[in-house]
Design a protein with these regions (language model features):
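SAM-dependent methyltransferases
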Residues: 1-163
Length: 163
């Protein structure tokens, strides 16, 4: 202490608000079995994001396949992260086949695309997106992270086929 003040002052809320936000360049792709718990999806997402040194605010969107539009665990994850949730058609995810690290016959039979988590993350990031964390899985869910070359916003997602 010098002059009665601690050497390391806590960052005030005002100073936190003045810090620039990190660019929203990460797309978090999620696939899951019907009815997968929000707890399981969140735990998998947290572990996957930790692999890329996740910082609050860097997730631009939680993305998946249209078949999962009403999946409570995916919707809860997006709300928890403060990120929008967007969905792609199976046809749009099928277009990402060549960029997938793994193709699943079981997923293809169920959805019409070869991979949901990786495909959705890559689709959200556009043709110059990079897969940072390939598909990770828990018992009933999958998760992947891709990075776009520029911030991802609603306009970019709509152009890339998200709904």
């Amino acid at each position: 202490m010098s002059g009665g003040l601690p050497e390391k002052m806590p960052i005030s809320a005002q100073r936190l608000r003045q810090r620039p936000l990190p660019p929203r360049v990460l797309a978090l792709g999620i696939g899951c079995e019907r009815g997968c718990s929000a707890v399981e999806i969140a735990a998998l997402a947290d572990a996957t994001l930790a692999e890329v040194g996740f910082e609050i605010g860097t997730v631009a969107a939680v993305v998946s396949i249209e078949l999962k539009r009403a999946e409570p665990g995916i919707l809860a994850l997006a709300a928890r992260l403060g990120a929008p949730v967007w969905f792609f058609t199976a046809a749009r995810l099928l277009a990402e086949t060549e960029r997938l690290s793994h193709r699943s016959t079981a997923v293809f039979r169920a959805t019409g695309c070869w991979g949901v988590a990786e495909g959705a993350a890559l689709a959200a990031c556009g043709s110059d997106g990079v897969l940072l964390v390939p598909k990770r899985r828990s018992r009933r869910a999958t998760c992947a992270v891709a990075r776009a070359s520029a911030p991802i916003d609603a306009t970019a997602l709509a152009v890339r086929g998200a709904r």
